[in-house]
Amino acid sequence: MTREVHEDSSVTQLASRAFRWSFFNTVASRLGPLFIGIALARLLGPEQFGVFAIATVTLMAVLSFNELGVSLAIIRWRDDPASIAPTTNTISVLSSALLTAAVVIGAPWISTALGDVQATPVVQVMALSIVINGLVATPAAILQREFMQKQRTIADQVKTWLGAGISLTLALFGWGAMSLAIGHLVASVVFAVMLLRWSPLPYRFGWNRAILGKLFRFGIPLALSSIVLCASGYADQMIVGSVLGAHALGLYVLAFNLASWPVSIFSHPLRAVAPAAFSALKDDPPRMSRNFSRVLALLSCVAVPVCLALSGAAEPVVGFVYGDAWQASADVLLWLAALAALRIWFELAYDYLVVIGKSGSVLVIQACSFAVSLPVMLLAVHPFGEAGVAAAQFAVSLAVVLPLYAISLHRSGVRISDSAKAVAIPVGTAILVWPAAWAFAQFIAIPFLAAAAAGLLAAAVIGALVYRLRDDVKALRLSGRAKGVT
């Protein structure tokens, strides 16, 4: 018993330390480049921003399955990961190289289908990142497995700042959307070199037929799920670009990026360590379930008020940060910021289900989401434009995806009643934040003051909610230090 408690304490310490590094990494990666991103948006305008968005959508779609899901097996592998790393390297690089060639050749067709054939060279440059990603998929998974978030933080910071600096410099010289593509590619190369340097395992290729079946049984369902997840996540941008053109896509993507801030700040650091932390507790399902509800409660206290404040104050936020040229994106941000709160919940549930081996359930959920949202968005895009597409996404997520995740979690041993209680007060309080933020937007004429008022209100609500759960916060902080009972 003592041994189990000490092992759990060790895992908690590692996960806690990794989460702190991951959270710092995310905040630093976002706050600095935020200002560079604002400058780039003002320099490029919606049209060029939309051209780059076409290339980004293409890249993200391919990266969702480029290594066939096998690198994530590294995290779950109970034995020494060195036994499967050479094989996962081979699979990742071969599949990524083939996909890179396919995208480069098919770039003109892809660009035309997504709204602007002028995006072709940008798509081709961005496609080179696919093979780079495949090259370091296994080292990245190993760093995550070993909670080496300090090294990952440094690599991410170099990638972020280097890419942003190159992009801004080229944009000032009139390179347009290509400036963003080149900055991304150069930074990806440097990032890959750093991960290869810091990986605890030497980089080797190999082919072990004895483990191929096990790898593919785990990876293929996860890759298929990621494809459906990507299709579901980017179908809105594909529809906006193909139907309304690059200018409308630029407006939509700007709103999407703004709405993704709460997801990036609060969810992504957790996702960097949650799979490994959950995996370490797989032999104790009740503890996993309790930890899930506890993390969900704390995450909701912080993230939901921010998302709804951003939604209510969308107009002054866009006007102050990006200027009048981007004001039309406020109608999109209103819906996507509210959707961000649901996305944070979904990502936590996704990681939990994957760790316990329910990747098939995740695939079903994402397939249902895609099947329902696609026709709804297609019906909404013509009469209501890009804002209608955003509203359709929110409606489907609330009415279809949320219940499906709840059912899957219940079948996996999570007490949904506990989870519902965990989010009831944060959600109920945050719902009151939205009309207050909207009122600030309507009655305060100066955009900066309206946005600041909404932000201060959200901060006050977060403080009150977190204070209410201060015992849980203290328990999480101290659990890693516990020597007797965790």
Language-model-derived ranges and their functions:
Residues S16, A73-A82, I132-V158, F173, ...:
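Membrane-interface junctions at transmembrane-helix termini in multi-pass inner-membrane proteins
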Residues M1-E4, V27, T90-G115, P121-V125, ...:
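Alpha-helical transmembrane segments of multi-pass membrane transport and lipid-handling proteins
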Residues T2-V11, A15, K150, V193-Y234, ...:
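Interhelical loop/hinge segments that connect adjacent transmembrane helices in multipass membrane
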Residues R3, V11-L68, S95-A107, Q124, ...:
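Signature of the first transmembrane helix
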Residues M1-L34, I75, D79-T90, V117-A119, ...:
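N-terminal membrane topogenesis motif
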